[in-house]
Each structure stands twice: as C-alpha cells, then as structure tokens.
Design a protein with these regions (language model features):
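Glycine-rich phosphate-binding loop of ATP-dependent small-molecule kinases
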Residues: 1-205
Length: 205
C-alpha cells in the first residue's frame, strides 16, 4: 500500500507512476528483474527515490498565519452547531453510527474543535477517546484493538483525539514501530476503515 498526495507542487500522475513501478518491481522479484537484488523475506519494499521538490507535502504549504476574522464568527458557529445537532438526532433515529478522527500538529486546535462539535451533541450519544501512549493491556494486543473496542453501536458516535494514523506518524518517526510494522499498517488501516464503512458507519477524518 502506498500514499500519493495529489495536492502538492509536483505532477501527481508522475509520482503515482513511479510508486506503481517500484511496487511492481518489488513483487516481480529477482527472476523477472535479475538486475535488482532480491529483498530479504518479510522486509518492506524501499520507497522510490524522490527529488526535493517531489518530497514536499501539503503540510509544507500550510499558511500558519491565516486567521478567521472575529466578525460574524459566533453567528456562523451557532448556525453550524444547530445544523450538526439536527443531523446527529436524525442519525440516532436512523441508527447510523459515526466515527470522527482528528489528527494534527500539537496545539493545532484538535481539542477546541472537538469541544465545539460536542457542544451541539447530546452527551448520551457520543464518546471522546483521547489517544495517548498505549497501556500494557493495549501493548499486548494488535495496535488497532484499542480503537476497535470503542467503535460505536448503532446510532451513536465516537470522536478520536488522535487515531490509528499514529502508527505511520509518531510511532514511525519516534521509532516505536519497526519498519515492517508501520509499512504493513497502511494496508491494515485501509482494511479497518473499509470494514467500518461496509458496516454503515459514517467516517469523517
């Protein structure tokens, strides 16, 4: 599994082609491509070489100086919360569950956004799960278990303050997950989210 960001200052089609080429080469193996050394069993395929420009992501283009003008903010917030409240009630009546995932830099406003969202919701119909370092109980199981156990029942919602994406973000960067573990996590995360969607859960990230 590989990710190709299509909102970056390089040709996403070219990057997708390079990524596919690397994946095909890694799966064909040494027989079809004798000029390439076979990768050790169980090791992830090396990422394709990228230029400095190609390595840029959408986060490199974020304008950290942008601010929302205070004029009309409260009115717009109240209107949005009212609409959200109506949608939440309708989802509860129709037994539609929802999972909302918040990821972002530290102090980027995740907690504030969650508070503004839950202010419009019946507290009996949702849970907020703050994801921190795993406990000993969680370490003894697959890393997705700590999220599976909070998947909401029909008509209810779960908001995750940080999520399973930590496996390929902080755990990868800080060295808490081995390369084979975080490489495998891309497919595991996709499968997990597909199972949620197949069950009729509304997933917002």
């Amino acid at each position: 599994m590989a990710w190709v960001d299509n909102d970056v200052p390089y040709d996403p089609d070219l990057m997708a082609g390079r990524t596919l080429l690397e994946r095909f080469r890694s799966h064909l193996g040494a027989t079809a491509l004798p000029h390439r050394a076979a990768a050790p069993a169980g090791s992830p395929a090396p990422p394709p070489a990228m230029s400095q420009e190609a390595s840029l992501t959408i986060l490199d283009r974020v304008d950290l100086k942008k601010k929302l003008p205070p004029e009309g903010y409260e009115r717009r917030l109240e209107k949005a919360q009212g609409r959200l409240g109506r949608l939440v009630r309708a989802a509860f009546e129709k037994k539609r569950s929802s999972v909302v995932v918040f990821e972002g830099w530290d102090a980027s406003g995740k907690g504030g956004n969650i508070r503004r969202i839950t202010a419009a919701m019946d507290p009996r119909t949702y849970r907020v799960i703050s994801v921190a370092a795993p406990t000993d109980e969680e370490k003894a199981r697959h890393y997705l278990w700590r999220f599976w156990r909070h998947v909401p029942r029909a008509g209810y919602g779960t908001l995750y303050d940080r999520s399973w994406y930590g496996r390929v973000l902080v755990e990868r960067v800080e060295g808490f997950a081995r390369s084979d573990e975080w490489s495998r996590a891309y497919l595991e995360i996709n499968d997990f989210e597909q199972q949620l969607a197949a069950h009729g859960i509304v997933l917002a990230k």
